[in-house]
Amino acid sequence: MSEFPFFSPQPLFSYMMNKNSRVHTDSNIRNTFFTEIGIGILANSFLLLFHIFKFIRGQRSRLTDLPIGLLSLIHLLMLLMGAFIAIDIFISWRGWDDIICKFLVYLYRSFRGLSLCTTCMLSVLQAITLSPRSSCLAKFKHKSPHHVSCAIISLSILYMFISSHLLVSINATPNLTTNNFMQVTQSCYIIPLSYLMQSMFSTLLAIRDISLISLMVLSTCYMVVLLCRHRNQIQHLQGTNLSPKASPEQRATQTILMLMTFFVLMSIFDSIVSCSRTMYLNDPTSYYIQIFVVYIYATVSPFVFMSTEKHIVNFLKSMCVRVKNV
């Protein structure tokens, strides 16, 4: 089996499983994993429908509404792809051909990259929304959703290109005369590319991740500075005994700051787990941990966004009251 570098182009949970692998027989891990995915699918579906109805009713949209709706759609599709892939991880049916393997793994990897991109874009747009009029970012406040859509489409094409190597390296029927492959699911295998191609795609992935996460951290720090400055100004004008009430923009910024922090922490944790899997290739514990970690952000993020929407909060409260009265 070949070892992959840290920023490797491996598609999902590539693991050195063999024919006697018992990953799919652990019912507790399987049930917990599908519960996590099921909760994430329901939450993202609810958030996506909320933004669709909001658009249909013609309500005034914020600069960040489109990325939030898009992020819920991306996470929904990513979780659906992950559910199909998980079925072939935990249930040994080996019924997929090359086309299904390439299609599912390629789409999953593309959606995961788009999740990172959209999260970064959301952080930058919120920093633009919060920026003062004297800032150089203020001129971007009045950009229409059309500009955001064009940026998203351009980045989508870029990410599909970066993940295109999977269309070659993913196969359903490996060459069993060689050990130079890694099993992704019970049906799908990844055959390593040449050293040159592997190095090129690893470099592209590393540049992508480092650039976007760095931009996310910079925009997050910028928002923290603006919030602290605004709070100090309010306290200076009203006195330290009064607690300034946060504006809707500030509450939204605090929510996105919390989400960005959670995303960065999960990314760091995922990187640590990936490193441990690289050093201890046959350790199933790291494999199980990465299965759960990779979907935590997609499952938790819709709840964070819904907690800031008064209409959703009031609707859920009324539903809870109705359930109690039944």
From Swiss-Prot:
The chain crosses the membrane at residues 33-53, 71-91, 105-127, 150-170, 210-230, 255-275, 286-306. GO terms for molecular function: pheromone receptor activity. Keywords: Cell membrane, Disulfide bond, G-protein coupled receptor, Glycoprotein, Membrane, Pheromone response, Receptor, Transducer, Transmembrane, Transmembrane helix. It is found in: Cell membrane. Glycans are attached at residue 175. It is a multi-pass membrane protein. Residues 54-70, 128-149, 231-254, 307-326 are cytoplasmic. InterPro entries: GPCR_Rhodpsn_7TM, Vmron_rcpt_1. The keyword Zinc does not apply. Expressed in 1-4% of neurons of the vomeronasal organ. Only one pheromone receptor gene may be expressed in a particular neuron. Not expressed in the main olfactory epithelium. Pfam families: V1R. Disulfide bonds join 101-188. Residues 1-32, 92-104, 171-209, 276-285 are extracellular. One of its GO terms (cellular component) is plasma membrane. GO terms for biological process: response to pheromone; sensory perception of chemical stimulus. It comes from the Eukaryota. Belongs to the G-protein coupled receptor 1 family. Putative pheromone receptor implicated in the regulation of social as well as reproductive behavior. PANTHER family: VOMERONASAL TYPE-1 RECEPTOR. This is Vomeronasal type-1 receptor 100.
